[in-house]
Amino acid sequence: MNKTHIDRRNFLATAAVAGAGLATAAARDWTGKNPTRYPDPDLISLDPRFDKYKIGNTPVQRLYTSPNALWTEGCAWNGVGRYLVFSDIPNDLQLRWVEDDNRVTVFRKPSGNSNGNTFDYRGRQISCQHGHRRVVRYEYDGTETVLAATFDDKPFNAPNDAVVHRGDNSIWFTDPGYGSLSDYEGNKGPLELKEAVYRIDAKSGKITKLTDDIHKPNGLCFSPDLSQLYVSDSGTGKNIKVWDVDGVKLKNGKEFASMKALKAQGEDRLATTKELAQKNTPSLMAAGGADGI
């Protein structure tokens, strides 16, 4: 008989031992929660054109929750470090979620009551500080460079959100002034400038006011081809406005979408997708008025 051949009796004996091991293994830890149903019922398309971009077997996941968290906002993804940075405005800190093990740790404290965050195309973090009424950049060594603090010799109201132009690396930001309305999310003080959208030139540092034809400019983003700028109005407008980008100027401003009919009270962060570029369709997160795009 071939020595490598296992006879039937030995095979059955081995299988019996293996089966016993499986039978005595620890019972699975069933939590009692209902299994996740796909597609996730919390993924809702207000426009049916968005349906084809859903990933049907992906649920909405909570990355962070804490009884100490007061108001988390301004998330920005770092594609090199594979981490998400976000602000807790009243707690005056920034937190970081790391992809490899889902841990969340304090990233920066104090943060100047930062709200919106983003990264430029050299990987440096840009933050809008409510408490100090300015836009700053964090260098590779962690030092802070002030990019915008005043305009026409007056302090900004409280910069809120920023986006970096992919073509010329300029920084475009909104200044609605929420961080100066109370001490809860900044430092209470008078608003000396009309709420507006601004641009910081990447080379000269010159600050240009682009438009103040909006009540409370909040979240903002460019269309994928950079030809248009979307800005959400979290004030009386409760809408998303869009302008044509003409170099360093905006023109032909108009309402892109009204948010007044949404049950969620407001829009916050805006983002566009390349696939929807033909329609220049931004997506948003509603939270209390027109907020982020």
Question: Can you say where each PLM-predicted feature lies in the sequence?
Answer:
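Beta-propeller fold detector
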Residues: 105-109, 145-149, 209-211, 251-258
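A short loop-to-beta-strand structural motif that recurs across blades of beta-propeller domains
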Residues: 93-95, 134-136, 196-198, 239-241
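N-terminal secretory signal peptides and thylakoid transit peptides that target proteins
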Residues: 2-18
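Short loop/turn segments immediately following beta-strands, especially the blade-tip
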Residues: 243-249
